Amino acid sequence: MKQYHDLLKHVLEQGAQKGDRTGTGTKSVFGYQMRFDLSEGFPMVTTKKLHLKSIIYELLWFLKGDTNIEYLKENGVRIWNEWADDNGDLGPVYGHQWRNWNGEEIDQIKEIVHSLKHNPNSRRMLVSAWNPSVLPDTSVSFSENVANGKAALPPCHAFFQFYVADGKLSCQLYQRSADIFLGVPFNIASYALLTMMMAQVCGYEAGDFIHTFGDAHIYSNHMEQVELQLSREPRQLPIMKINPEVKDIFDFKFEDFTLEDYDPHPGIKAKVAI
C-alpha cells in the first residue's frame, strides 16, 4: 500500500497546522488523490492490522439502508457507538441517503445498478450522502440532532461515482474530510469492496478505485502512531474472494466474503477524535 504511505508522508511534510471541531488539532492538506488497480490485490493496509469484520458489516449496514447501530452491535461492531442516541439511532446518515434520499422513495443504489446494466456509458452514475437539509447543528449534541430529525454526523465520504470502460467497472470516491490514520484505511477497503460487489452483480470486472480527498488530516494525537506505521515495510496485498453465486447487490451476507493471504503487522491503537 505504497499509495497510503505516500499520503501519510505528504501530510507530515506538507501539511498545515489547523484547528478542528473536536479541539484535538490536525496537520492537514487540501486536495489529494490515490488510485488502486483492483486486479493487483485487495487494498487492505498491511502495516497495521485492520478489523475486516467491521469493514464488511458496516458496508452491508449501509446497503440495508439502516441507521440504527443494533445490527452492528449484534455482529460485534462498535465503530458507531459514540455517536448514537440512547435508542441506537444516528438519524439520516449514509444508509438512509443511499437508499431513501430525503425520506422519499429515491433509492440511489438501485438506480446505479439499473444504469450499470442498461446504460453503462452514463455520466450520471453518482451516489450522494451529502444532504444539506439534514446536516447536524454543531451547537447541540449528537442525540439532540437525531431527535430533531438531523444526522448525528455529516457524511465524511460524501459521494461516489461509477465509470465503465473496456468491460471494467471503476469507482471514484470524494471524501470531504479524512482522518487518515484511523478512518482512511477503512474507507479504502470499504469502497474497493463495494466496487467489486457492484462489478460482480452487473457483469463487469473490477477496475480501479480512485480515492479523492478534500481536507485530509492527521490528528495531533496520532503522530507517534503514524511514525510507527511508516517505519514498517508494506507486505503483499491480500486477495478478496466473493461468493460468485450472489447476483443481487442486496443479497450479500458476511459469509460471502473471504480474505486470503492477509499478513499484516500488529494493530496500532489510537483514540478517535469525537
Swiss-Prot record:
GO CC, any one term: cytosol
GO BP of this protein: dTMP biosynthetic process; dTTP biosynthetic process; methylation
Pathway(s) where this gene product acts: Pyrimidine metabolism; dTTP biosynthesis
EC number in record: 2.1.1.45
Organism superkingdom: Bacteria
UniProt-annotated catalytic positions: C156
Keyword Transcription belongs to the record: no
Binding site for (6R)-5,10-methylene-5,6,7,8-tetrahydrofolate: H51, D179, A273
Signal peptide (from-to): none
Gene Ontology MF terms in the entry: thymidylate synthase activity
Residues that hold dUMP according to the record: R21, R123, R124, R176, S177, A178, D179, N187, H217, I218, Y219
Compartment annotation: Cytoplasm
InterPro entries per record: Thymidate_synth/dCMP_Mease, Thymidate_synth/dCMP_Mease_dom, Thymidate_synth/dCMP_Mease_sf, Thymidylate_synthase
Classification via Gene3D superfamilies: Thymidylate synthase/dCMP hydroxymethylase domain (3.30.572.10)
Entry keywords, A to Z: Cytoplasm, Methyltransferase, Nucleotide biosynthesis, Transferase
One Pfam family per UniProt: Thymidylat_synt
Catalytic activity: dUMP + (6R)-5,10-methylene-5,6,7,8-tetrahydrofolate = 7,8-dihydrofolate + dTMP
Record-stated family: Belongs to the thymidylate synthase family. Bacterial-type ThyA subfamily.
Function noted in UniProt: Catalyzes the reductive methylation of 2'-deoxyuridine-5'-monophosphate (dUMP) to 2'-deoxythymidine-5'-monophosphate (dTMP) while utilizing 5,10-methylenetetrahydrofolate (mTHF) as the methyl donor and reductant in the reaction, yielding dihydrofolate (DHF) as a by-product. This enzymatic reaction provides an intracellular de novo source of dTMP, an essential precursor for DNA biosynthesis.
Subunit-structure text: Homodimer.
Annotated protein name in UniProt: Thymidylate synthase
Taxonomic source organism: Christiangramia forsetii (strain DSM 17595 / CGMCC 1.15422 / KT0803) (Gramella forsetii)
Gene behind this protein: thyA
